[in-house]
A protein has these predicted regions:
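A surface/extracellular/periplasmic glyco- and lipid-processing/surface-interacting theme
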Residues: 1-41, 48-316
């Protein structure tokens, strides 16, 4: 059957595995990451000081031998993991995230509390040296009595093109280089016409997976633009519910899209009305018809709508 995460054909047993979502370090002292190129979906968003954290969502992790380095949770990441009904693994958390980590709907696992086994590698300094394996994470799910399989009525968050041939958008903008606007790590993607993938760069060099030795590459890139609010201490406050605009990049083109996400609850303990939702974000074209995504891996950027002009779509 087809993967719920990539739209590609995979083994039936793997297709109904509950995904594992891992909070990846993305500061230079923690690079290179290990295993992240095998993630089916990667989320990126800012935390304090403009530094970005990545969250890799894995379903087919049979050939993943190392995952890391793992860092602490920020409040909006468990809700991004919940969009894929994933179990979410982190190592520590911000004070604001602590408000949500006991929610059983979010299936969170904190290595700092001993929720899963890990190792501290000697080739990096703390806190940039926490690594683990998929086997450790699955064992943690079993020990916590979290099902390792999705429900039979599970519905994929994204709607994929049924054909392996990419959809052509003649009216879309040509996009060979996509500059994300994340200034701290100067992150951008470059399109390779030969294989139809976007290759990731940051900190002035290709972003390499230590485990494979390969540069990270994806078929699709989605931007979800959200209000750039802040908590009282200046930490980013990103509310993922409501509606807004976004960007879809694939197969050498880019087009502006729309998104919406339902509210399931409101938390008033964080100095604001923090709206949250467990369900997936719905992406649509400008005419409100559902976005059809090309088969393959997807990188999703959570980005402040006020900084939209910093996203650069370049034709070379």
């Amino acid at each position: 059957m087809r993967s719920f995460l990539t739209g590609e054909w995979i083994n039936d047993t793997i297709a109904y595995r509950r995904p594992i979502a891992v909070m990846y370090n993305n500061i230079q002292a923690g690079l290179p990451q290990s295993g992240i190129s095998k993630a089916d979906v990667i989320f990126e968003g800012q935390c304090e000081g403009g530094v970005t954290r990545l969250m890799g969502v894995f379903q087919n992790y049979d050939d993943v031998t190392s995952i890391g380095s793992i860092r602490s949770c920020r409040d909006y990441y468990p809700f991004l993991a919940a969009e894929y009904d994933a179990a979410y693994f982190h190592f520590g958390q911000s004070d604001f995230a602590l408000e949500f980590l006991g929610d059983p709907e979010l299936r969170t696992f904190n290595g700092m509390n001993g929720d899963y086994n890990y190792e501290r590698r000697s080739d990096r300094v703390s806190p940039h040296n926490v690594f683990t394996t998929p086997e450790n994470l699955v064992t943690a799910m079993v020990n916590k009595k979290v099902s390792t399989y999705l429900d039979e009525d599970y519905v994929a968050p994204l709607k994929f093109n049924k054909s392996a041939e990419p959809i052509e958008y003649p009216d879309a903008d040509k996009c060979i280089t996509l500059k994300t606007g994340y200034a701290y790590n100067d992150a951008y993607f470059v399109y390779n016409e030969e294989d139809g993938l976007y290759y990731r760069y940051e900190y002035g060099q290709p972003q390499i997976d230590e485990m494979t030795g390969e540069q990270i590459a994806v078929k699709n890139i989605i931007f979800k633009l959200v209000p750039g609010e802040q908590y009282w201490n200046g930490s980013p406050l990103y509310l993922l519910t409501g509606s807004g605009i976004g960007l879809y990049v694939s197969n050498g083109t880019a087009q502006w899209i729309k998104w919406s996400k339902e509210v399931d609850g409101v938390n008033t303990n964080l100095g604001c009305n923090y709206t949250y939702g467990y369900g997936p974000t719905r992406y649509t074209y400008w005419d409100d018809s559902e976005l059809i995504v090309n088969q393959g891996k997807t990188w999703i950027c959570i980005y402040e709508q006020e900084n939209q002009p910093n996203i650069q779509i370049l034709d070379k």
